[in-house]
């Protein structure tokens, strides 16, 4: 009954546009530059209480509402970040795609629709998908290849927690791999997963993918990532997810201190990942 009630609330929240975004900065480790952010959807009820994303996102997927959630995310990214992205062509915002977004191809159409006339360039909107989105491998490969041809970079998110990671990675048209926080947490511990982290990094580099470490919280983790030559990271060591205005301030201060992203980040497609049978 409680889940049914929450489902009804979510439908109302989507209709009333109560969902909003926070932005977690993504940092280039060699330079300290803020190259962009990951857009993270949030839901605050009218009474001020927050509903956790790990509750309402799976519910939206189960109830067939995830497409509407993704539409709102895309619309809000364009609205929130238009001024920043037009002013700083080296910056990008990453949006998360659900399995339905990939199988339907709707997210790509909605992104193109909302970007039209905004001044935002396709390479400034990155698309991220978890391994759960690749159940239909052929469809996923087609949609992600279309996204890359349109100018978007594509990343696999939360890598390492899926059921067939290695098999899928070689078959998908990707630009970047984001290592799941659980593997970053294992750095320097006796965890059974700790030997997996360097293997993931090496595998990504062999395939020519950028590596983004998620959930970085300690200086020890950061030092390890430097030694492994991981390019990018995000996590509370750098910043919590921020409301739009706070992220703009964060990005501006970081830019004043470290500068803008290097030329290769301004056009990710300048480093294409071409593999036989993929594109």
Features from the language model and the residues they span:
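Bacterial c-di-GMP phosphodiesterase EAL domain
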Residues: 2-120, 132, 146, 166, ...
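C-terminal helical cap(s) of enzyme catalytic domains, especially alpha/beta-barrels
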Residues: 10, 226, 242-269, 274
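Short alpha-helix boundary/capping motifs
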Residues: 38, 84, 88, 101, ...
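Residues that scaffold the ATP/ADP-binding catalytic core of kinase and kinase-like folds
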Residues: 59, 105, 137, 186-187, ...
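Conserved acetyl-CoA-binding loop-helix of GNAT-fold acetyltransferases
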Residues: 69-72, 193-199
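Amphipathic, coiled-coil-like alpha-helical segments
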Residues: 128, 147, 272-279
């Amino acid at each position: 009954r409680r889940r049914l009630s929450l489902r009804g609330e979510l439908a109302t929240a989507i209709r009333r546009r109560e969902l909003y975004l926070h932005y977690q900065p993504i940092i280039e480790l060699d330079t300290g530059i803020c190259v962009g952010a990951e857009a993270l959807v949030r839901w605050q009820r009218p009474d001020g209480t927050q509903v956790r994303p790990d509750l309402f996102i799976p519910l939206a997927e189960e109830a067939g509402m995830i497409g509407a959630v993704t539409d709102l995310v895309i619309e809000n990214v364009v609205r929130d970040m238009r001024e920043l992205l037009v002013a700083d062509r080296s910056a990008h915002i990453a949006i998360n795609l659900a399995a339905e977004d990939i199988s339907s191809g709707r997210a790509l159409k909605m992104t193109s629709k909302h970007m039209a006339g905004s001044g935002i360039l396709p390479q400034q909107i990155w698309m991220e998908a978890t391994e759960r989105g690749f159940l239909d491998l052929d469809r996923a490969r087609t949609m992600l290849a279309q996204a890359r041809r349109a100018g978007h970079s594509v990343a696999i998110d939360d890598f390492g927690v899926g059921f067939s990671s290695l098999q899928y990675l070689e078959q998908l048209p990707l630009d970047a791999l984001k290592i799941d926080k659980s593997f970053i947490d294992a750095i320097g511990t006796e965890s059974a997963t700790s030997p997996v982290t360097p293997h993931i990094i090496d595998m990504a580099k062999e395939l020519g993918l950028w590596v983004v470490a998620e959930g970085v919280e300690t200086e020890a983790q950061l030092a390890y990532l430097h030694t492994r030559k991981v390019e990018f990271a995000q996590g509370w060591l750098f910043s919590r997810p921020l409301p739009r205005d706070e992220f703009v301030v964060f990005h501006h201060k970081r830019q004043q201190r470290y500068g803008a992203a290097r030329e290769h980040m301004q056009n990710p497609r300048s480093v294409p990942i071409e593999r036989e049978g993929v594109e």
